[in-house]
Amino acid sequence: MDYNMDYAPHEVISQQGERFVDKYVDRKILKNKKSLLVIISLSVLSVVGFVLFYFTPNSRKSDLFKNSSVENNNDDYIINSLLKSPNGKKFIVSKIDEALSFYDSKKNDINKYNEGNNNNNADFKGLSLFKENTPSNNFIHNKDYFINFFDNKFLMNNAEHINQFYMFIKTNNKQYNSPNEMKERFQVFLQNAHKVNMHNNNKNSLYKKELNRFADLTYHEFKNKYLSLRSSKPLKNSKYLLDQMNYEEVIKKYKGNENFDHAAYDWRLHSGVTPVKDQKNCGSCWAFSSIGSVESQYAIRKNKLITLSEQELVDCSFKNYGCNGGLINNAFEDMIELGGICTDDDYPYVSDAPNLCNIDRCTEKYGIKNYLSVPDNKLKEALRFLGPISISVAVSDDFAFYKEGIFDGECGDQLNHAVMLVGFGMKEIVNPLTKKGEKHYYYIIKNSWGQQWGERGFINIETDESGLMRKCGLGTDAFIPLIE
């Protein structure tokens, strides 16, 4: 990757001098080293002032760590004030550009160092945040040494990331309890930013990443908090489950002798998918997956657009574990035994707040008669004729930072997340090597991480025309609720 500058370092100095010195002063004064020192000092002091304002814990600014979403916020004014000077911006950009050029020049040496040491337990294998090429600076061993918001060199090398982190805090209403916690989160943020940037510079990938609300979490933290699907066990004695032996009978009822196009079908275009929701800080993906497919059945079979209560399942599905995870099939089992589910208006979602089961909150409930296990080689057929499917998938940190495109990244090492399969499609993409168009098939997945994640809450995962390619174990567990 090449980082090009539109100007040379000496041009920055000249332009800054012309801005700060009166136009009537003799031109020889512009070359004086004292002027250069003043300019640099002003830039450094501005950035240091920004950091002092944001990262010094005191009584007036303690709200930053406990509540960063203050309505009457002067943060934008401070950021704009610091960045409105063309001289200050050019100076900082030149420093960042210089640092990035250094990073690229050292990349190969660092990779060789990593391979030679084969140290899989390092906190972070990557390039130093500083510019000295010393072994102690090639890796982050001591975050307190590297993350120093009062170090001018650190600020100059990371001004862009610091501003990016500030915007991340504000956009996602992040709350940190102390400056030390903020430093730790900033370190994780930098590591995730590095991964995202490296991926997005790979022209051979079919998808793009972005820093989202998970950017200050390690993958281990993210997995423990959001990937809560439990290992599935066959329900041999279930009186509600129609197993794969019953599949042909059910599909014949809805399909008949009709053939279908294996290239594309999207239930979102046929009023069969309700809006994307957000499970927030609760490991309740199993509830959102199962409730979502029930909502789709009522939309398709009854022409009713309803929003049902995931919270009732979280509170009352005793075969599952609330915010600590669960199983899709257990959700359907309990849904039937509860006699149906209230609407979200009657039983609203409160995420991880403690809530006792209260099945009497509503008089009208929406239930299912039974549910069907879908063979993993019949996903496209079942999706086309029966409707959206509640499925399992093995999620990784690549998946977590998905932005757009067809996901062809790394998968998790086990099934850990419940989502909905709502469609499939095909897109022709030009191969950057052959310069020829190639057909790429994908499944359309509805997630439960809000509409700000991915493609408005959805992700496209690569497959083949037949749908037999099931990346990330997609559809290993696959169930459709039946209301007729």
UniProtKB/Swiss-Prot annotation:
Cytoplasmic topological intervals: 1-35
GO biological process terms, semicolon-separated: proteolysis; proteolysis involved in protein catabolic process
S-S bridge residues: C282-C323, C316-C357, C342-C362, C411-C472
Record note on pH: Optimum pH is 4.5-5.5 for host hemoglobin. Optimum pH is 5-6 for host globin. Optimum pH is 7-7.5 for host ankyrin. Optimum pH is 5-6.5 for synthetic substrates.
Pfam families the UniProt entry points to: Inhibitor_I29, Peptidase_C1
Gene Ontology CC terms, in alphabetical order: extracellular space; food vacuole; lysosome; membrane
Family: Belongs to the peptidase C1 family.
Protein name: Falcipain-2a
Record organism: Plasmodium falciparum (isolate 3D7)
